[in-house]
């Protein structure tokens, strides 16, 4: 009798433009399966903004400058930092993949990818609701490199799910349930040696 895997594992990275629903999706995945821990590549940037620059509210200009300056020193600084934090995790979600080099490193570390698409109209509505006082500053950053949501996907390492903001929440949740269950079933069918 073959022993079977007792515990599945999956590391997920979510990509999409600002206000496409990345954090909402990560939180939904965690509700569906509470084994997941959510990480953000941008959290260390936000921590620097808050702790060293006194940022009280999200200052996208400052965050972009911090992220860019640190990437000038090492383009992979943020991804390496998170790879170290997540190396022993079996169930984790990175909710903010934005750059090709991040994809390349995450791919090599066994992550699967979910890509979100948001229309400009919906994005603008969400930005206005989320940042009513300074939404215009966020709108001006829509063309920044971090907002392209375009990748050169390696064969076999394309997104496992692509979600358009036009899909209803119920359909998205059903798709996520199905995907997680399929992964669980696939891993349970692999015999241990």
Language-model features, listed with the residues they occupy:
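Hydrophobic positions on the alpha1 helix immediately C-terminal to the Walker A/P-loop
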Residues: 25
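Conserved lysine of the Walker
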Residues: 22
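ATP-dependent NMP and nucleoside kinases share a basic, alpha-helical "lid"
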Residues: 32, 37, 83-131
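P-loop (Walker A) phosphate-binding loop of NTP-binding proteins
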Residues: 17
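Active-site signature of alpha/beta-hydrolase-fold catalytic machinery across serine-
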Residues: 28
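ATP-dependent small-molecule kinase phosphotransfer cores
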Residues: 37-92, 98-104
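Small-molecule kinase domains that catalyze NTP-dependent phosphoryl transfer to phosphate-bearing small molecules
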Residues: 77, 82, 107, 116-193
């Amino acid at each position: 009798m073959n022993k079977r895997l007792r515990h599945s594992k999956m590391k997920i990275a979510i990509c999409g433009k600002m206000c496409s629903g990345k954090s909402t999706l990560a939180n939904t995945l965690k509700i569906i399966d509470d084994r997941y821990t959510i990480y953000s590549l941008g959290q260390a940037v936000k921590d620097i903004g808050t702790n060293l620059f006194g940022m009280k509210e999200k200052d996208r200009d400052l965050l972009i400058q911090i992220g860019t300056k640190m990437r000038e020193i090492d383009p992979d600084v943020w991804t390496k930092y998170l790879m170290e934090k997540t190396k022993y995790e079996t169930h984790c979600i990175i909710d903010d993949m934005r750059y090709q080099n991040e994809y390349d490193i995450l791919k090599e570390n066994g992550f699967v990818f979910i890509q979100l698409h948001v229309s400009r109209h919906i994005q603008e509505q969400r930005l206005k609701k989320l940042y009513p006082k300074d939404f215009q500053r966020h709108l001006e950053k829509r063309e920044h490199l971090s907002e392209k949501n375009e990748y050169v996907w390696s064969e076999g390492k394309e997104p496992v799910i692509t979600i358009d903001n036009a899909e209803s929440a119920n359909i998205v949740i059903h798709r996520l349930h199905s995907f997680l269950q399929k992964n669980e079933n696939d891993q349970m069918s692999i015999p241990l040696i």
